[in-house]
Amino acid sequence: MVRKLKFHEQKLLKQVDFLNWEVTDHNLHELRVLRRYRLQRREDYTRYNQLSRAVRELARRLRDLPERDPFRVRSSAALLDKLYALGLVPTRGSQELCDFVTASSFCRRRLPTVLLKLRMAQHLQAAVAFVEQGHVRVGPDVVTDPAFLVTRSMEDFVTWVDSSKIKRHVLEYNEERDDFDLDA
């Protein structure tokens, strides 16, 4: 037997239509991306989605201009150069590559994902932990935010912090540790 619903429960059920409810596939895709790239804040995903939508919209508007327009040529080249420098498109080839920029493209340029690509971590979860604990630096700066986007030019400067135990362990394993450098 089911108990009788209380007044506030009846009021809440009046707002829900169990016969014609909609399933949003965006939510499932969003959860899949959040889980795959270990995004901790949903706001990061929505920001990446907005940016990718803006890039696609800008590319579409540039494509609508006449083909010989000097503004179109100059702006398209600038857009492709910027997207290539950020690492969102594989080549500077054509403007159609802008249509394939998604939120996942931005997620692939996050620091933990780049750590995984550089084989500095075995799992994405470990890479996120390394970044949050301050074991990783990009250039001279220690980065503790996993949402940090690494450009193509900065990808070469991703290294361990000098005082990191992980760096010490890696150097000992490779038999490259210098006692003079790591006494700090």
Swiss-Prot record:
Keyword RNA-binding attached: yes
Record GO terms (molecular function): rRNA binding; snoRNA binding
The Gene Ontology biological process terms listed for this entry are:
ribosomal small subunit biogenesis; rRNA processing
Q: Where is the S4 RNA-binding domain?
A: 109-175
Species for this entry:
Bos taurus
Q: Which family does it belong to?
A: Belongs to the universal ribosomal protein uS4 family.
Q: How does it assemble?
A: Part of the small subunit (SSU) processome, composed of more than 70 proteins and the RNA chaperone small nucleolar RNA (snoRNA) U3. Component of a heterotrimeric complex containing IMP3, IMP4 and MPHOSPH10. Interacts with MPHOSPH10.
User: Transmembrane stretches, by residue range?
Assistant: none
Mention any one GO cellular component term assigned to this protein in its UniProt record.
Answer: small-subunit processome
What function is annotated for this protein? Component of the 60-80S U3 small nucleolar ribonucleoprotein (U3 snoRNP). Required for the early cleavages during pre-18S ribosomal RNA processing. Part of the small subunit (SSU) processome, first precursor of the small eukaryotic ribosomal subunit. During the assembly of the SSU processome in the nucleolus, many ribosome biogenesis factors, an RNA chaperone and ribosomal proteins associate with the nascent pre-rRNA and work in concert to generate RNA folding, modifications, rearrangements and cleavage as well as targeted degradation of pre-ribosomal RNA by the RNA exosome.
What name does this protein carry? Answer: U3 small nucleolar ribonucleoprotein protein IMP3
Q: Which domain of life is it from?
A: Eukaryota
The record, for InterPro entries, names:
Ribosomal_uS4, Ribosomal_uS4_N, S4_RNA-bd, S4_RNA-bd_sf
Pfam family, any one: Ribosomal_S4
Q: Which Gene3D superfamilies match?
A: RNA-binding S4 domain
Q: Principal place where this protein is found?
A: nucleus
User: What PROSITE patterns does UniProt report for this protein, alphabetically?
Assistant: S4 (PS50889)
Gene transcribed to yield this protein: IMP3
